[in-house]
Amino acid sequence: MPTSHENALQQRCQQIVTSPVLSPEQKRHFLALEAENNLPYPALPVEARRALDEGVICDMFEGHAPYKPRYVLPDYARFLAHGSEWLELEGAKDLDDALSLLTILYHHVPSVTSMPVYLGQLDALLQPYVRILTQDEIDIRIKRFWRYLDRTLPDAFMHANIGPSDSPITRAILRADAELKQVSPNLTFIYDPEITPDDLLLEVAKNICECSKPHIANGPVHDKIFTKGGYGIVSCYNSLPLAGGGSTLVRLNLKAIAERSESLDDFFTRTLPHYCQQQIAIIDARCEFLYQQSHFFENSFLVKEGLINPERFVPMFGMYGLAEAVNLLCEKEGIAARYGKEAAANEVGYRISAQLAEFVANTPVKYGWQKRAMLHAQSGISSDIGTTPGARLPYGDEPDPITHLQTVAPHHAYYYSGISDILTLDETIKRNPQALVQLCLGAFKAGMREFTANVSGNDLVRVTGYMVRLSDLEKYRAEGSRTNTTWLGEEAARNTRILERQPRVISHEQQMRFSQ
């Protein structure tokens, strides 16, 4: 007789294979996750296991047997220059070669989503192969390439980078993205005031007005951590070492930790340090399996051909629910202040970020770049209820954009592997994109690492860091979607008031399960 566990597994698999809204490829993906999650979890200390079971710590549903890194950032420049022995490919000689080679390699780059989350610094990669092509000839090729990416790798966590320099490829990508208004790929423009022309930044702002893309990253801030050109921004907005990536992402539920604290002092001296240690234990256990049992780094041709280096992978030490944690702690202390509203509450939030950063900087991990994890303000998952992503302000009653940026900016100094806040701007900004440029520059002057904006009235909007079409959400449940992240946005709409709120789109990252 089948056990209750076996019956439950069969029921979940049956739900997947009979779903009217999943494509065959999507069904295969979720069936594989069910199989992986039927395996035993890596051995954990008792307290770490309890924290995971109680939801104080979340492993992002990455799976019980991490047999591949969460995020992989290959050295695409090396690949284009030398080709691949494993794939029996010679190096590129022209732009057509380069685009063809990239489209081949993308299908061999693993990630938590089973699709590549990093496409490379595309303008820097492709510009050397342009040769004698005219701008029109470049535009045709890039538009075709852009459409190919969305149709064959339909996942909005797939992320391309451009900038800080100007080039015909840079302009072609911006034109294609604005015209096609695709959910994927995600896009970040890396800004450097010493390199980026003013008219190029204005063009980037016009693109945001048109399609809510790209993110704009503060290049000099990232350069200090990774060195110039030594990193990529992937998935939603994760900053990670190039030729490496992110091995795993585990996150603290700060709201749950605050609920288990007797006072503000108890939070900082007992509960937060305790759960930080448990999170490190989970990170180490997952990385131990990846490095020692999965054999990924021993067998991958990406390692053998020098496209990735196991020592350049870093675990991400995530957190979320800061807003709720601060409000709970203020209530326990009798402080009449709310996060994002009063300075006293904001200071508690900054203190939490500072203590997390100090812990991560001073706590070694078994496997990781520089033997440390990297702090990440995690942007939520689609099933989260009652928590605000990362260090963001609670949704629905945000202040004006300038006050908003000034309030969240101090957090950005601490989160080396990514933090983002989404501004929602009135569509009148389309008549004055220079105002958007000034907002961005002001944000960077205040210390922000990333600038991201949605423009009211656009069908294409950003949910956390990934894109969805609002029109797709309305028809997903009846018809399904070829894009793997539409269901996440639809689930977020069911679990929150995303479609009822003022035009700020909430943030949720990939959740590794299927629910009808």
Predicted regions span which residues?
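Well-ordered alpha-helical scaffold segments within catalytic/enzyme domains
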Residues: E324-K332
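Conserved catalytic cores of very large enzyme subunits
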Residues: P2-E311, K332, R338-E342, E358-S515
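Conserved phosphate/anionic-ligand binding catalytic regions in large, soluble enzymes, centered on
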Residues: V117, N309-A325
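Active-site loop/helix belt of alpha/beta enzymes
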Residues: R338, E342-E347, S353
